[in-house]
Structure formats: C-alpha cells, structure tokens
UniProtKB/Swiss-Prot annotation:
Pfam families: GatZ_KbaZ-like. NCBIfam families: agaZ_gatZ, PRK15052.1. This is D-tagatose-1,6-bisphosphate aldolase subunit GatZ. GO terms for biological process: D-tagatose 6-phosphate catabolic process; galactitol metabolic process; phosphoenolpyruvate-dependent sugar phosphotransferase system. It comes from Escherichia coli O17:K52:H18 (strain UMN026 / ExPEC). InterPro entries: Aldolase_TIM, GatZ/KbaZ-like, GatZ_KbaZ_carbometab, TagBP_ald_GatZ. It comes from the Bacteria. GO terms for cellular component: plasma membrane. Keywords: Galactitol metabolism.
Length: 420
C-alpha cells in the first residue's frame, strides 16, 4: 500500500479498488481478474464480518486469511500480491456495551487482525458505546483510535511494521449499508478532515506513537457518493475540490467508502481528486446475484420441472422465514419487501448465500447447467454483455465463467478509474 500511495503522491494517476466481500466467488473473481497483471489485490474484511469471535461469517482473521489464500492457490494468484485489510476495526460490534468493555474487545480485535498478517488497518472508534454521548467528541474518537493503534503496534513484528498502514476517520453509514432512503449526502468539510488529522496526531503522540503516525496513509471522508436500495448519489467533482486541494499538502490520500454503482468516469475522477482507495462490496455481490438469477431463469427453461433447483423460490422462502438481515432495511409492505429482497442495490441477499438451503440450491442449478449447451439466444436474453464476449471469442458459455465475467464487469470499471 505504501508504494502505491507514494506513486500517487508523486503525481501518478493510480488508485486501488478495495474488495469488501467474503463471498468465495467474489474473491475468486477479484483474484482471477488480475491474475495476469502485475497489480496487487486489496481484499478487506469488516469487524462485524470477521472478528476474534467469528463474526457473522464464523471466521476469525486467521481463518479469513487462510480462506483467501486457499482461493488464491486454486486460482494461481501469488499470495504475496494480496493485501489484506481490516475495515471499521473498533467497537462497532459492541456498541451496546460500556466503552471500557467494548474497547477491551476492540483491542483484541485489532491484535487478532495484525497477528493474522493483515497490513491495512482502519482504526475506527467513531461509534458511541453504552453511556457515551452521541456523537462522540472528535478528541475521544482520536484517543480511542490511538489505543487501537498501540495495540496493533504492540503485536506487529519488525517485518510487519514495514508493510503496516493505517486509515483513520469515518464519514460513512454504519457498516452494512444505509437503513433508509437517501436524498442527498453531506460532503466532508475541509475543516472537519483537518480536525480529524489534528486530533489523531495529538492523541497518537500522547501515547508515544509518533513513528506509527508515519504509517497513516489515508483519511476516510465523504466525497459525495452514496447509495441506498434504489437510489445512487453520483460523484460531483466540483463539490469535492476543496477536499482534493487540502489533501495535496499532506502525505496522505483519501479512502472513499460506498463507491458502488458509480460510473467508470466517476472512478477516474475520484482517483484524480486523491480518493485513491475506492471501497466496493454490494455492487460485486449484486453482480453475482444478477448472474445467478439469470442462470436460474435459463435453468427453468432448459431443465425438466422435477430436476430443477428451485433456486429463486428457495432464496425467497429463506429470506422471508429469516428476515433478520433485511427487515430493518427494506420497505414494510409485502410486495415492496419482495422487490427489495430480489433487486435492492444494498443487496441484503449477500448475507444469505452461505445458508445451507440456498447454497445447495445454487449448487444444484450449477450442476444442472454444467452439462447443458446453453443456446446463445438465451445468453443474449439474460446476459447480453457476456453474449457479446462469447461472440468475440473472449468468453465461453460455461455457467461458472458467466458468473465470473458478470463480476468482472464491476471490476473493469474500477480498473479504468484506478488506471495503472
């Protein structure tokens, strides 16, 4: 990461896409997409997804590392070209506890990530815990971030410190996405970004972490990009120019969250304006969902009723029976809920792919289609971009490859923006 940031600060138009997903097909796609390039791939886990207690993926940081490395080995992607990151590392998962208890767990969380070899660490202590004022004072946020940084430094080896980098600040919704419709978004003021940096510098130095400050590579700010279930707020470069100009006087770049669904031109403009780390998650699993839905429609027409997977019906049944991952995010009416379950841009389906019933139904669908010759006309109907690539000889009409290429479409836009 440090080399990439140095190149950007030297005037090169270069950025990196941060893949925030634990889905094996998304990770496979991210690695396979850059297998034949010289680029490194940044894959990040969030604190609620992966933590010392397992998170909702039932993986510790060490488990997640091995999970990613196993996929890399299978794909033929060199492990040393993978950068592992930890996102929103702090009290996010334990906000219902008092600050002392939550921070104690947060310290162990950060240590677990660093011990597992994660080298990009987002120190995010911005969330209020039980008994805390809402919002927290910037000084309190910075002091808690310094505690987390001290924890990281205490377990990092000398070799790890050479690679270790920190991201500070937050200007994003709670990890997982917006819970309500958005109409506009507040762009971070330069004064607030400067205050984030100033308070963190003061807190780090007070804890004897002056050297660790040199490892802070980025600040999270809100450049004016966001999405909810059916709306996308697109990047307006002119609105972010004060931020773009301010960061030029520092050693750092910005990290932009929720950049999903922006245009490829917007990604290029974001990187130009020093938002050099672009995080993406739901857009990748949304593309995966689109591909699986398309293949399910194809299966319905090609496979006898008694042998079909019933994939779409299974997904719907499971999500309606177990609504805990979408209920507070989606509209309450039954028909509206169904539409959101299937097509929401926030893609809450991503939490359900590991469910045994859904996983089994998708596997059945894939087995059903693997041995079939899918008519080109059907691919044109349901996966038109992939049809074009089949026609030009770039792609084969194999279900797994069709899914990969659908996810590549998202990665292609980021590659354009992060041009190396």
């Amino acid at each position: 990461m440090k080399t990439l940031i140095a190149r950007h600060k030297a005037g090169e138009h270069i950025g990196i896409c941060s893949v925030c997903s634990a889905h094996p097909l998304v990770i496979e796609a991210a690695l396979a997409f850059d297998r034949n390039s010289t680029r490194k791939v940044l894959i990040e886990a969030t604190s609620n997804q992966v933590n010392q207690f397992g998170g909702y993926t039932c993986m510790t940081p060490a488990d997640f590392r091995e999970f990613v490395f196993a996929i890399a080995d299978r794909v033929g992607f060199a492990r040393e070209r993978i950068i592992l990151g930890g996102d929103h590392l702090g009290p996010n998962c334990w906000q219902q506890e008092n600050a002392d208890a939550a921070m104690e767990k947060s310290v162990e969380l950060v240590k677990a990530y660093v011990r597992a070899g994660f080298s990009k660490i987002h120190l995010d202590a911005s969330m209020s815990c039980a008994g805390d004022p809402i919002p927290l004072a910037p000084e309190t946020v910075a002091e808690r971030a310094a505690v987390l940084c001290f924890a990281a430094e205490s377990v990092a080896t000398d070799c790890q410190r050479e690679q270790l980098s920190y991201v500070i600040g937050t200007e994003v919704p709670v990890p997982g996405g917006e819970a309500s419709a958005i109409q506009s978004v507040h762009i971070t003021h330069v004064e607030d970004a400067a205050n984030t940096l100033r308070t963190h510098q003061k807190a780090f130095i007070a804890r004897g972490l002056a050297e660790a400050l040199t490892r802070v590579i980025a600040i999270v700010v809100q450049p004016g990009v966001e999405f909810d279930h059916s709306n996308i707020i697109h990047y307006q470069p002119q609105e972010a120019q004060p931020l773009a100009q301010w960061i030029e006087n520092t050693r750092m770049v910005y990290e932009a969250h929720s950049t999903d669904y922006q245009t490829r031109t917007a990604y290029w403009e974001l990187v130009r304006d020093h938002f050099a780390i672009l995080k993406v998650g739901p857009a990748l699993t949304f593309a995966l969902r689109e591909a699986i839905f398309a293949l399910a429609q194809i299966e319905q027409e090609l496979i006898a009723p008694e042998n079909r997977s019933g994939c779409l019906a299974v997904i719907e049944e499971v999500m309606l029976d177990e609504p805990q991952y979408w209920k507070k995010y989606y509209r309450p009416g039954f028909n509206d809920s169904l539409l959101d379950i299937r097509y929401s841009l926030s893609d809450r389906i991503r939490y359900y792919w590991p469910h045994s019933r859904i996983k089994n139904s998708v596997e059945t669908m894939m087995v059903n289609l693997e041995g079939m010759e899918i008519p080109l006309g059907m691919i044109s109907q349901y996966l038109p971009k992939q049809f074009e690539r089949i026609q030009s000889g770039e792609l084969s009409a194999i279900p797994h490859q069709l899914i990969m290429d659908k996810i590549y479409d998202v990665l292609r836009a980021y590659r354009y923006g992060c041009a190396e």
